[in-house]
């Protein structure tokens, strides 16, 4: 997921995506713990995507405070 694409989405959609990514990250960590995860890079990708979404949400919240 690219930050440019995420910025085009609505805030509500980003919040839903944040919940989805957090659940996916939890599931990937659980699978890794039980040795059922084949591609451990999915954890890293999920963490970074979640961070991108949270960053954009924070930027929007701060922009609303200033306005």
From Swiss-Prot:
SUPFAM superfamilies: Ribosomal protein L29 (L29p) (SSF46561). One of its GO terms (biological process) is translation. GO terms for cellular component: ribonucleoprotein complex; ribosome. It comes from the Bacteria. Keywords: Ribonucleoprotein, Ribosomal protein. InterPro entries: Ribosomal_uL29, Ribosomal_uL29_sf. One of its GO terms (molecular function) is structural constituent of ribosome. The keyword Coiled coil does not apply. Gene3D superfamilies: 1.10.287.310. Belongs to the universal ribosomal protein uL29 family. HAMAP family: Ribosomal_uL29. This is Large ribosomal subunit protein uL29. It comes from Sorangium cellulosum (strain So ce56). The lineage of its organism: Bacteria, Pseudomonadati, Myxococcota, Polyangia, Polyangiales. The gene is rpmC.
């Amino acid at each position: 997921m690219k930050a440019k694409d995420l910025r085009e989405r609505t805030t509500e959609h980003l919040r839903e995506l944040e919940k989805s990514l957090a659940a996916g990250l939890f599931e990937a960590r659980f699978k890794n713990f039980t040795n059922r995860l084949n591609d451990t890079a999915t954890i890293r990708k999920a963490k970074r995507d979640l961070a991108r979404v949270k960053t954009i949400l924070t930027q929007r919240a701060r922009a609303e405070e200033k306005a």
